[in-house]
Amino acid sequence: MTDRQTDTAPSPSYHLLPGRRRTVDAAASRGQGPEPAPGGGVEGVGARGVALKLFVQLLGCSRFGGAVVRAGEAEPSGAARSASSGREEPQPEEGEEEEEKEEERGPQWRLGARKPGSWTGEAAVCADSAPAARAPQALARASGRGGRVARRGAEESGPPHSPSRRGSASRAGPGRASETMNFLLSWVHWSLALLLYLHHAKWSQAAPMAEGGGQNHHEVVKFMDVYQRSYCHPIETLVDIFQEYPDEIEYIFKPSCVPLMRCGGCCNDEGLECVPTEESNITMQIMRIKPHQGQHIGEMSFLQHNKCECRPKKDRARQEKKSVRGKGKGQKRKRKKSRYKSWSVPCGPCSERRKHLFVQDPQTCKCSCKNTDSRCKARQLELNERTCRCDKPRR
């Protein structure tokens, strides 16, 4: 009697451990329920070892939301789960049909689940996360209530399912998972290869550009480019504002020069000069500063050259004579007056290029600068008395 009780003693995980299920089924076929082990429930060294082994299996599959079942065995039915948890739940016939359909489909493996042949030596079949979450609770309840509840659950569970389908399904699960992992690894491999190819192509295109940039320092400009750039055409030139407005010497302009399009370049002939053929005015905002009084921004108009041509040079001396000479009595009177003026004022010009910077006394023929030393110092410059310009201070 003691040996039979020991062999048929139910445990809360009898549906998870091979060898225990056969004893329970044999007792059910004889019409006898398995008697509880001495001490009631899962107690003793053997039951603790079974519980520890079950906990290790559940811990291995808990990450993936499923329970652990031995390879070749069927998943526990609803009645067996109710027996392990200490609750009686009716299982309709429709539930059995659904279980058979699930067996035909095979177990659903999650990526990263343990495969057969792992360190536990068992096949992990990850099912729904709800049974796996209830497994530790069922173990505790079954250990507390004893073998009577387990016997009742064994009688209601009925004959076990055929292990052939479950075994084949458990073998099919790892194959699908391995195919999925192989596909993902191959996809990652080809993606990395494509990135390396594109990176290499990018650097190969950048290398010739870098080499070409190094050759630009020693590049020889062609003749046609030199000729077109140097020929007579409008070019942007920085023009001093005082040169355009010589009478407004009481102001300090900011900026002191403006960019204007002016004719410039070569005509390739000494008898020709680059002159504008079309002109226009442009208005700019310039800041006018009056020392010790204030400043304001005003609009000033400047002359720009739109078109330029190379034309014969004109003799300025002859042009002046032609303008002086004329026909009629009026012109003769003007010539006489100019002669008298030249006799009465024999003073020469202070400067031929910078006449607007000097002031000449007609009686003494003394030249003085329009700019003053204080005005130049206000601009942090020094007055050059020879040129009457504000130059940078010498160091």
Curated annotation (Swiss-Prot):
Q: Which UniProt keywords apply?
A: Angiogenesis, Cytoplasm, Developmental protein, Differentiation, Disulfide bond, Endoplasmic reticulum, Extracellular matrix, Glycoprotein, Golgi apparatus, Growth factor, Heparin-binding, Mitogen, Nucleus, Secreted
Q: What species is this protein from?
A: Homo sapiens
Q: Which family does it belong to?
A: Belongs to the PDGF/VEGF growth factor family.
Residues bearing carbohydrate: N281
Region listing for Disordered, in residue ranges:
1-45, 73-175, 314-344
Q: Which disease is it linked to?
A: Microvascular complications of diabetes 1: Pathological conditions that develop in numerous tissues and organs as a consequence of diabetes mellitus. They include diabetic retinopathy, diabetic nephropathy leading to end-stage renal disease, and diabetic neuropathy. Diabetic retinopathy remains the major cause of new-onset blindness among diabetic adults. It is characterized by vascular permeability and increased tissue ischemia and angiogenesis.
| Protein's recorded name | Vascular endothelial growth factor A, long form
Single Gene Ontology BP annotation: positive regulation of phosphatidylinositol 3-kinase/protein kinase B signal transduction
